[in-house]
Amino acid sequence: MEATTTVARWTWGRDLEGAPAVESGVGACLRELLTAHQVLHSHRLMVGTPRMSVSVHEAGKKNTYLFRGETQPTVADAPVEAAQEVARRVHEAMSSGEIGSVYAHIDSPGDVLLGDDFRREPGLFRLGGSALLGYVGVDLATRTDFWLPYDLKGRAQPDVYAANAPRLSAALRDLSEALDSDTDPDDPTCFAKPNETGAENYFDEGGNARDVWDSFERHPVRGRAW
């Protein structure tokens, strides 16, 4: 099942001590993002050539962009070289001004294991990257419940969980290693409680998985959002 808002999110981040201003901005953001994408691609949780939405904010000016657009690398399977290539194109297209924060994200289909076959799911994850003042961060979010023991309606899905939860857990572990940062589960959402290895359902006092779909998705009053 897929919700209209985030089911679970995980984050990573670190300081880039001693990095020059340019390297700690656009280039660093894209390098971390594409490094993370390569990890997810290896687990088939993101598939295809990444198409990135990139925003470069001007320092000290609210809602002012030096660059805002979509781009994708031509270099495959080499995140550092791909990030350098895309960063160079972004810098060439940027307006003049001091770089403030940099944000980028990838929305990508991924493969879910159902029975003996993989099924392609559009928008399985959103992968985000950011850079500001020498700090780089990455976040991974999903609106789906393939990683939970019970679906969003509280129904047991042991086969789906057994097939896909270990894939997510392995990806989170590999992301921590690739990004040189501990996996930090984000705050619980109304659908699930993320942890370092995946996510957990909510349960009522009787020990039954809660039907969070009926509570929050039956009559949604919002559009699709992350």
Model segments located where?
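Acidic, proline/glycine-rich low-complexity IDRs
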Residues: 134-226
